[in-house]
Amino acid sequence: IFEFKAGQYAELFIGDCKEKHFSMANSPNTNELEFHIKTLDGGEVSNYIKNDLKLGEIITVKGPYGNAYLREKHKGPIIAVAGGTGLAPILSIIEYSQEIEMKQPINIYYGAQSEQELYFIEKLDMITKTNNNLKFNPVIIEKSKNKSIRQGLVTDALIEDINDFDGYKAYLAG
């Protein structure tokens, strides 16, 4: 069993590739590890996973690492900011916070260049609609016809929405 805290990451050794760090994207309460991996031009590990990884191939996982994990005893409001695949550790934090029934306000900001770069948006919409303490704020730089997605920078949206950050815990990834 690989034990970790929501928000942490692991070091993966895959094939003959150089080790690579990826954040867990699921709750620590499962018997699985979920990683979100974007295929990058020239990305040795991501391209190996996409094109060459075989079913049953051994992947060595070391860790966990990182201090940006959910502080379960914090009772004040939380801000979770993600960009790109930085959504992975934020999803881990959000999922676990709901499992342990944290009730304080949790404001999720998810930024990207375009609407096409946003992923898991339906899952986040569903989670926030069924949990009154969660608020989901997708923000993109490019214009969109989708009125539920704000245009601009995620940092500007955050400042527009919250004028006093006293007492907040913030988790940022991406």
Roles of regions detected by a PLM:
Residues 24, 91-99:
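Histidine-anchored nucleotide/phosphate-binding helix
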Residues 105-174:
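Reductase modules of NAD(P)H-dependent flavoproteins
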Residues 63-75:
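A short, basic/flexible loop-to-alpha-helix module at the beginning of a structural domain
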Residues 43, 60-64, 151-156:
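Short gly/ser/thr-rich secondary-structure transition/capping motifs
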Residues 1-57, 112-114, 139-143:
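Ferredoxin-reductase
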Residues 78-93:
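A phosphate-binding catalytic loop at a beta-strand-loop-alpha-helix junction
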Residues 75, 96-106:
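Conserved S-adenosyl-L-methionine
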